[in-house]
Amino acid sequence: MHKNNTTFLSRVFGINSRNIDVHNPLFADDSVIPLYDQNQSAYYDNAYSDYSSDEEDSKPRTSRQTDSNLHMTDHSGDGNDPFNQMDNSSRFSNSSSFHYNNTDQEDDNPELLLLQDEDSSLNRKNLDNSDFQSFAKKTFNQIPKIKFQLPKKEDYPTSHRQPPDIENQNGTLKSSVKKQIHFLDPMDKALWMWSNVSNLDTFLHQVYDYYTGNGFNCIMMNKFTELFTVVFIVWLFSFMGNCIDYDKLMNDRNVYQFSQVKIDKCYSKIGFFPQKLIYWLFFIGLCLKLYQIFLDYLVLKDMKLFFNLLLGLSDDELQTISWGLVVKRIMILRDKNINAIVSQNTDLTSRKRMNAHDIANRILRKENYMIAMYNKSILDLDIELPLIGKVQLLTNTLQWNLNIAILDYFFDSETGQINLPALKERNRHTISTELKKRLIFCGIINIVLAPILSIYFIMYYFLKFFYDFKTNPADISSREYSPYARWKLREFNELPHIFNRRLNISTESSNKYINQFPKETTTALLKFIMFISGSIVGVLVIVTILDPEFFLNFELTPGRTVLFYVSTLGAIFTICKNSIPDDTLVFDPEVSLRYLSQFTHYLPQEWEGKYHTEEVKNDFCKLYTLKLYLVGKEILSWLFLPYILCYKLPECADTISDFFREFSVHVDGLGYVCTFAMFQFNNQHNENGNANVHQNGNGNGGVPSAKSKSKKVPNPNRFTTKPSMRDMENDDKMIKSYMYFLESYGNDEIVQHQQALNRSLIYSTEISPTSGDDLNDSNILGLRQRNVATTGKRQNSIGNGLIYNGQNKRLSIGEAKTNVYSNPIASTVLDKDLQYKLANSYILNGMPGLNEANQPADRKNERKYSNDSPGVMKLVDKISQQHKA
């Protein structure tokens, strides 16, 4: 740069511009620097010329000549000069100069006027403000120009970055990272997967399926065996239908080898329609299934890393540990990890709200609605059959159709959340119309697929059960719970594996309850048949032992050898023997059914006083029915499914729409869930009909508190379509669900509803808690808290056992104790010692039917128990006073 520029920079900034390189190596381009300097010089020259001409025109004539040639120099080094305050090392010499000219003249131009320091003050006084502005502006051209190229927009290093796509769940940045995720360490990959969960419902479903499938190897083996089972059934059916000459097999007695009845090149003789078309469709479906298995394989690999590395659980441990332990480790992982920067899950509340209750609600979001609909009889699935009467026709096939027609319509397939338009009352007519169309469409599809699928299921069930019935004929009379019973007996937020375990435990008690009913006529007939068949089998076996070679091929009837009759009569003997009840069984159906209710959690009020009748037994047998009957109903259901889907269920479309709209509540961090799954007991008896809705998640992510925001929920009784069907509140469905949920998981984080639960239990006995503090929650919970502290086993509210059996009728001591022991809630959460104390306390507090004279003798036990739990005794006394009144 020019010397003038150097002097200016040195006086103002104390630096030497000759030694400064303002070249920017990041953006510089040597090929364009000269061109850039030329353009910049022309730009500033033009700007200065325009400005200078304007300045000259605006000045007076007297000042134009003075300003035309101006040169100021300071040689004095006066302390008053601000430039003299600078370090002397920054100056080129002992003198400092201010050079200005309005042309590009050199500094030694003799025409410049030199102004000495002593005259500078005088000359400066003659300059007005515009002169100073002109002076400052004229120095602008002397400032050194920075040599760099202005980069274009696409040249920026960060130009490849795209803003995150909020609406797209995948996101551009996340997708680019996901392509490189396989290069990460397994632990880092597992952490990345956990931190970038965008759909928590789907993720928890995958976690639960991995747990119930017992690990990676077991799940993949099951998937391939199921696929090969379908392939084998189709191949076997095709081969037997096309490649065997049945005419020769049945009529030709000279046939002894399979090759004699096998048709060569049998598949080349079949036509395109319908067999080859069916085979091509099956092949396409097989390819799609293989692709789905491949996608599942990728997900299972990630789940394996998640369980093995993050949760510290190997696949072998998954077969023995409880689900509660998995939930606890997920909660620990939740507390120790946060979302990654690239995660699109901005709802941090959903990650914080992840306790056992929230996890169950996410996994069973759809199932909770179905449990409520079946318990409230929203779906009309009954048909009238001649000579049989009304039959409840819910099969596994019908459940698949309901999931497609109803659940897939109300829930979003990607997020798993309920579709918001379905909750708008103004859309009621539209939703009902669309729901009817979907149901009718499913019915039409069933009409088209009925012939093919009926044949498939016949083959499947035949191959599945024939060998079992042949090797163990007693299984032909075995029973299991029907699909309708499984929905009826299932609790809210009860995971499938917990529910199956509960039903499996109840199987033995169910068989004992049914078999103890006297059936003398049938028993006598079965004993006679068993004796005849057993005698013939015994004779044939003895003769066969004497001469095995002759009698094994000896034909008793044309075409029927001894071996055939031994096998057939042996099966008949086994069936009759297992159908005869055990002689040691004691007939006491009431005690048996109450004991059974510990596991089924099902004891309807209309059964009260009729436990010994055939009516109650038949009602229970509709739930726990013959397995052979269920198989036949599953096969024949293809004849009735179109009728149910096209005519019966469309009439329920309005009710289904109203149910989803009026029994859905929104929970922050959780989304819309079924009202009954939130265990809101304190709003069951609200006269205004308001249901408390949890809006703000707490720190523990627990169950909603009573202080949550309220939303209007209608009376649930409007959905009860049968007069004999009790309302869900009277049946204590939610209470039993909540109690069993606490028993399954523990209530470390779910204690907020205990107060509302006890209040609801008091209300259910029609006792008004208005007499002071003797019915407060602390007294009711007194014994429960003491049991937790002493035994370490969590004992849930004992008040439920007291109130549940507090019926106004005469009871003996044995009956009262039986009522307490058989209570479906109390007996599952209380040990036998506490049940015995509870029964005695229940009896010894003035209940009807007791001799008052006998009470003082037993008061010792009562006082001893009262000292242990005064709150419970006060509650018992309160109940007694109500009964006496």
From Swiss-Prot:
Compositionally biased residues, Basic and acidic residues: 857-866
All ranges on the Cytoplasmic side of the membrane: 1-223, 301-438, 460-524, 577-625, 647-885
Cell location: Preautophagosomal structure membrane; Cytoplasmic vesicle membrane; Vacuole membrane; Golgi apparatus membrane
Topology within the bilayer: Multi-pass membrane protein
Keyword Magnesium belongs to the record: no
Membership in a protein family: Belongs to the ATG9 family.
Name of this chain's protein: Autophagy-related protein 9
Organism, as annotated: Komagataella pastoris
Gene giving rise to this polypeptide: ATG9
